[in-house]
Amino acid sequence: MVRSPWFIPSITLTRITVFGFPNSPNQTQNLGFLDQRLALQWVRNNIAAFGGDREKVTIFGQSSGGYSVKQLFARPPNPLPFRAIIMESQATSLSSNGGDWNKLVNLTKCSTARSQFQCVRDIDAKVIKAIIETNALAFTPTLLDSETTVKNFTNAVTSRTTAQVPLIIGNNQDEGTAFTVDVTDLEKYLSRYYYDKTVRDKIISQYPVSEYGSSAYHRASAMGRDIAYQCPTAMLANLTAENGIKTYRYLFNASFPNNNYSFFPDGGAYHASEIYEIFGTYNRTGAIPRQRDLSVVMQTYWANFAKNLEPGVGWPRLGTNGGLDVINFGGNESSTGYLISQSSVDRKCTTFWDQYLSTS
């Protein structure tokens, strides 16, 4: 991604799963988010030693990293350690209710310990990791923490308590394919999102066989994309733009044979596939000219945004340019991006999903 000598990348590692988000009662919550704040403070205190300017920091993240960036935007540290943000495929959060912590306590036989938290901490981390993976425990952030998260994102934006900084936000066309390859039962798949039977039936009717084919894989993929990524991204982008925040939105819709995986066929522009283009780490073997061109264009836009607080010519702010204000990276018309309307990609969001989803 480093295409200019003035760009200094700083990549941080934070705790995840139970190590970062244990959700244990009466303990500090969202430790992983606290790690990120500490890392930003370190950058603020030390980036000058590397030739950087602490007043010109742009933060960006993808997937759970995009969600982390969203929460930093919603409840910013003081003093503000960044001046711009990029959210790639920021996922809507299913906030933890502590259920997985209780399961882990039982699985580790710590339920009768005087301190369940200390009992779990005393167990080797590799053992804990194996238990989590074997039992598919998902330790996610909690919105009950008033230090690093907000519960009502809409109120935060409209009340101007978020960071007042420009942002790039977007998602991929086929976000769901990587997560739904084994789906054969749509009812069962939707139950993980906690929708009741009546709502599940309505959702399934929105993704008919006539439009998506008979494969549960492709129908579930489209559902997952809209539930977790596409529609929350659309809602958040419009919310920020309507409240005076410079917002630039993209859709990544490019796929290349040398980035495909055999374990989820017809993956398309799958979750995280844009990272290869942004960092320039795509497989050079089999790379085609338009793949190389797209990588250069996306890297240039990202770097321009970090330097100038706008991506540059050809990518207008959301809410301008007569409605053609979303840049489509890929697709059929241009290998390096062209402008489309939100209505062309958000149809199901505005006609159906907005009643069930939120920006949080």
Mark where each language-model region is.
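C-terminal, loop-rich substrate-recognition/catalytic regions characterized by aromatic stacking residues
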Residues: 162-206, 346-359
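Serine-hydrolase-like catalytic core of hydrolytic proteins
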Residues: 1-117, 156-179, 293, 307-313
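Mobile gating loops/cap/lid regions near enzyme active sites that modulate substrate access
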Residues: 234, 238-360
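A structural signal for well-ordered alpha-helical segments within the folded catalytic domains
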Residues: 34-41, 67, 99, 137, ...
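Short glycine/proline-rich turn/loop motifs
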Residues: 18-24, 203-219, 278-285
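Active-site rim elements
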Residues: 27-30, 90-93, 106, 154, ...
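Alpha/beta-hydrolase fold catalytic core
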Residues: 196-242, 247-249, 254
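Substrate-access "cap/lid" subdomains that shape
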Residues: 79, 84-190, 220-225, 230-242
